[in-house]
Amino acid sequence: MELKQLITFITAAEHVNFTLTAKMLNYAQSSVTSQIKSLEEEIGTPLFERLGKRLILTEAGKTFKSYAQKIIALTEEAKMATNQVRETTGTLKIGATESQCTYRLPPIIKEFKQAFPQVKLIFKPYISNEQAKEQLLQGQLDITFILDVNRMEDALHVESLIQDEIKMVAANDHPFPADLPVTLKDLQNETLLLTEDGCSYRTLFENNLHDSGIYPNKLEFVSIEAIKQCVMAGLGIGILPEMTVKDDIAAGRMKELNWQSDCPVFTQLAWHKDKWMSAPLKAFIDLTRKTFK
């Protein structure tokens, strides 16, 4: 028993005319006759009585009509319920760094969860932008936040949200004055506290150092919070996004050195160009745009 057979039967039962039914449903009349015959064979009793050219709904047909209407109504209700669940549940796998999860995303997450409480959010850290982009290409992430320069990507949609300043910070008692410019040459004998290899702003900064023939000592950390603690302990100079250190600078826990990055980086949102946009994913993107803009 197929849904289309039930729809054909209901239409025929309401108009008691196979020719009109065929015209209304865009079927050949033979198709209508065949569908009704299949139903009658499956049920085991005639649904229509044919008296010459007249078509009469049998008592069995009248009884079956009420059930057929219920089946069709329940089918539509099931479709609507399923679509509603599909649109408001599920899982979003989001790539983000520690600093983005800590300083950028909490207000977005809060508002999103209020709108989509049944959608599960999984935030996955990554070592480098290239790793995050590869995970998008492989379908391991639905969307990712990256911190990078503006560049074109063949298979990805990359949208810059906000420019991020990169700051050079040191302990308050570091000998570098806060008001005098710091040059790359000044860093030759310093210890730099850096994020993991593959971080976009670290790569840009180190390229500038190497182009100038400067190779300072360096300590590498997985955690930005660890770098900040080491900066405040006087273990070296940190190169970090402004969002991660502005509160510490304002509170006097460390000082900003007079240095300007010559290559702007941006918080960006990226996803595969062929990614199917579910309602939760589209809402997350729209909310992120609204928050940053």
From Swiss-Prot:
DNA-binding region, residue intervals: 18-37
Disulfide bonds: none
Keyword DNA-binding: yes
HTH lysR-type domain mapped to chain residues: 1-58
Keywords: Cytoplasm, DNA-binding, Transcription, Transcription regulation
Entry keyword Cytoplasm: yes
Domain of life: Bacteria
Protein localization: Cytoplasm
One BP term from GO: regulation of DNA-templated transcription
GO cellular component, one term: cytoplasm
GO molecular function, one term: transcription cis-regulatory region binding
Family, similarity comment: Belongs to the LysR transcriptional regulatory family.
Name this protein carries in UniProt: Uncharacterized HTH-type transcriptional regulator YwqM
Source organism phylogeny: Bacteria, Bacillati, Bacillota, Bacilli, Bacillales
